[in-house]
């Protein structure tokens, strides 16, 4: 589950970075500011994808983070605690760096030319966002698929 959701979420995040880089020709977050009011659709999709990456309940990243944490808690509690701290620090980093530096504050004149997402960018990202939402709310289909494969693998290895 972790690899599946990670692929969906990071695919979306990399595409979002590509969109802003194509327009601004920089990846320096400190160069931006106030973009939420200028490119609101991009801001919204970035927030959903970022929160999915954090493991926010209701998004696909939650279940993969939950199962990894739950599995490690019973086996190696110290690593589970370190992982929990990692989640907290990641949340703080994303909220501070990306949201505050890039989207909040006063818009900079330098970026007045930036336009919001085009229809094809939206069409490209919506399947990824829909997958994040669907498997965040109802993960059973993907879990059943992985469970069947893992049971088969386990039986083969135990023979």
Predicted features by range, described:
Residues 1-114, 135:
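Functional transmembrane alpha-helices
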Residues 39-41, 95-159:
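Cytoplasmic/organellar membrane-interface segments at the starts of transmembrane helices
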């Amino acid at each position: 589950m972790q690899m599946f959701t990670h692929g969906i979420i990071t695919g979306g995040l990399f595409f979002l970075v590509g969109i802003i880089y194509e327009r601004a020709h920089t990846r320096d977050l400190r160069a931006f500011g106030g973009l939420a009011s200028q490119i609101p659709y991009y801001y919204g999709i970035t927030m959903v994808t970022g929160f999915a990456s954090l493991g926010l309940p209701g998004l696909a990243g939650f279940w993969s983070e939950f199962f990894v944490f739950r599995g490690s808690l019973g086996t190696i509690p110290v690593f589970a605690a370190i992982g929990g701290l990692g989640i907290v620090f990641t949340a703080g980093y994303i909220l501070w760096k990306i949201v505050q530096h890039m989207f909040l504050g006063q818009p900079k004149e330098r970026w007045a030319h930036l336009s919001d997402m085009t229809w094809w960018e939206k069409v490209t990202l919506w399947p990824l966002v829909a997958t994040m939402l669907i498997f965040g709310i109802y993960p059973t289909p993907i879990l059943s698929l992985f469970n069947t494969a893992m049971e088969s693998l386990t039986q083969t290895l135990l023979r």
